[in-house]
Amino acid sequence: MSDDNKQDFKKGISNSFVWFLMAAFLFALMVQNFIDTKFAKVSFSYQLEHLVNLQLLQPEDSRKIALNDNLVTFSGKFRDRLTEEGKTRYKYLELLDTNHELKAEQARVKDEIKTLKTKVFDSASLFLQLSGLSIPKGGYVVVDDMYNTPEEDQSVVIKDLPKSAVESLVSLEKEYEAARQNPTAESLKNLGNLINELLRNLRSPALGIGSETIKQSLKGIDKEVADSGATSLSEQLAAYGHALVNLKAIIDELNHEEDHIRLAKLRSVRNYKETLDEYNQINTRLDDNQIQLDKARQSVSNVIWYFNNQELSTKALEKQDPEVYNQWFSKAKEEWANFSHNRGGIFRAPDQPLNAVLEKTFKSEEPSPNYFSYLFTLLPVLLVILVLYMLFARQMKGMGNTAMNFGKSPARLLNKGDNKITFKDVAGVDEALEELQEIVEFLKNPQKFTSLGGKIPKGVLCIGPPGTGKTLIAKAVAGEADRPFFSISGSDFVEMFVGVGASRIRDLFEQAKKAAPCIIFMDEIDAVGRHRGVGMGGGHDEREQTLNQLLVEMDGFDTNEGVILMAATNRPDVLDKALLRPGRFDRRVIIGLPDIKGRYDILKVHARRIKMDPSIDLMAIARSTPGSSGADLANILNESALLAARKGRTAVTAQETIEARDKVLYGKERRSLEIDENEKRTTAYHESGHTVVGLIVKSGDPVDKVTIIPRGMSLGATMFLPKKNRVSYWKQELHDQLAVLMGGRVAEEIFVGDVSSGAQQDIERATQLARSMVCKWGMSDKLGAVAYDERSEGGGQYGFGDHHEKTYSDETAQAIDSEVRRILDEALAIARKIILDYKEQVELLTLMLIEFETLDSEDIQEIVVKNNWDAVRKRERLKRAADLHKKEAATPPPPPPREVDISSSGTIPNTLGLSS
């Protein structure tokens, strides 16, 4: 009987109810623990500087546990109330910050006064010229010396006037008297023109009358003079006389002295007086602040402050950079304001870097295991796992066959406001942005186009090499229009299940129609848009079914629904023709590699977030990176920032940008490659030959640098800086370029007495260039302007590349070979003559390359052209470049006592400054 009762009791209580009781009990324990303890907001070690400086912590409760040499876990407790010493310290810091702000404001206003004073001189001089007033012996005083300060002369006195042809009121009065005695139509017409000219000058911005009453008076006089032109001579004369009387009254009103200032109704004078008043107010506030600061300084004269991981005296704290101090004080102000919340609270911060505050003020202790805290740490995780298990178990019971839900589109959606990229973040592709501006206008205001019966392009295909910003432009279009943006890759439609790709296409367009107007961006569309009928499955493979569905969706949805498909590819030649026809992708935007201006604009965009030295010339970087994409340029600046950080600099210098450019474009330096002295000397002669010939030829590009440091697959390199965008080649330029290519081989022959295989690439490039001159560009006098290089476009149905067909006779082939040989021999002769003429410079350049390994354009000019080379000056330049923006080494801690107990810590303090 008892067993039956037990079974009935078990049946009455479900497992879910038991789990609920356990979870409720554990949750109650957690809540009780959190209610009894007040936690403070301290998470980082840099906060401790302000907490210790302002005496917000109880020193006896401040402890740290060392995890390793650099990381600690610290804990502590806030005081229950502020100390008087802490209030005094905060008052001093606040006064010092205010002092910095007032001094900066004083300097700004002082500069503004200088600018306004010049404007007052100009407007007052123009007034004297227009009024005809004579300058007194002591000068015409605009602003009295009452506004002078012991340091600055703020008065404005005009002692002479510049020569000018403007008519004055005095001269007009004389003209009026002459016309009144003998009034004629000609004299009155001349008088009216002079009065109009005077009115224009008085109403001009150069004089700048700021009184609205005077402006209206001048406007009325102008109208009166204009209306009198159609009246009789006597009426004209009377109107002109009345106008001159009114102008005289206006001149007297402007010349009236008020509060030791004349011309107070001119904007320049009024602004000058207001700025003077502001300057005096700032000086008064600064004097009051200085008195309070001097008094507060006496109370904290013996305090040692923790400032950005340094220990500073009060005197040293006041010498810190005001901007750095302001940022530091803002954190202290925040901690001071948060004390009301943190009062009496405890805190604990794990895995924080060790700093001076932790080292000096926090007590060290050994970590003690707290198994009860482990339980509360793991308890939330266990509860989350339990809840997730119950949710998934319930879902799996009702899912059935819908578990394999592969037909949904995996497109990622950026809603309005999430996409912060606009056209301001895109540079170097101005033509592409102009093409896409119409798309943005449609997304912002569709009715503007549809009301007139116009149709917006249904599809936009962005074509360009990798890294030119196709995806970025698509995001910018969505961000500029502030519309939803669906992004997906062409490979996302390819799956192992039949029909998944077509299903995802349908689902993608359904989602897009619900969010219209919007943009669908399909990256690498060639993954699904290739020519049909060439796959492994004939016309029935999965990719072609996906393409067919895409074609139907593009041709099926209406433009008024506001769904625009943008796609990107760098292989437009493999796309299906049906995909490219008008009505689908009916607008193609070519995004090519940027030119010099484009590269410069791209560099400016990426340089915004990098702290760079002002001496860096972004245009020089743009000029030295022909053929680079936007991604390459961004990588160059990122590499330069990493190099600067590795060298311990506070800002990126020109040296890092050059190293980063060479690393990205030519490969990383291989300094570990073992090269004997003979090989190094031969490489130096080889590169010196290239350099000297490149400098001497008439049409060569300037030499940027020469190096014998192995990089990539080469043992050395001579780098040139193009003067302009290369859109075409001239015959003389090509001959000079061939001579430069032959310069390295000629230098080896002359100075080494032998030739090496290092000139292999030079000979290949020279031969290819000479053959192009003969066969493609018609630059051979013997063979004439005939193209012998017949190219057949491949890459069609079977994907074969381009191939060349020989369409000329064997005799012509021999003539081509002999002409190519002649051009190369001429280039060899030119290079040999230049090397022999500049033999001494080649020798010196070789020696300096062996010593310094790399020479820049300034060094090369001094050696080859100017003949004023100084190796000492070169070493000084290298030292200055190495020390530029170097971080100051931290002050080492004081040495420990002579007897050190290492039994507790297990380590010996590092007193020699050696890195561990």
Swiss-Prot record:
InterPro entries: AAA+_ATPase, AAA_lid_3, ATPase_AAA_core, ATPase_AAA_CS, FtsH, P-loop_NTPase, Peptidase_M41, Peptidase_M41-like. It is a multi-pass membrane protein. GO terms for molecular function: ATP binding; ATP hydrolysis activity; ATP-dependent peptidase activity; metalloendopeptidase activity; zinc ion binding. Residues 93-916 are annotated as: ATP-dependent zinc metalloprotease FtsH. Residues 38-371 are periplasmic. Residues 883-916 are annotated as: Disordered. Its cofactor is Zn(2+). ATP binds at G464, P465, P466, G467, T468, G469, K470, T471. Residues 1-92 are annotated as: Unknown. Residues 1-16, 393-916 are cytoplasmic. It is an enzyme of class 3 (hydrolase). One of its GO terms (biological process) is protein catabolic process. Homohexamer. Acts as a processive, ATP-dependent zinc metallopeptidase for both cytoplasmic and membrane proteins. Plays a role in the quality control of integral membrane proteins. In the central section; belongs to the AAA ATPase family. This is ATP-dependent zinc metalloprotease FtsH. It comes from Protochlamydia amoebophila (strain UWE25).
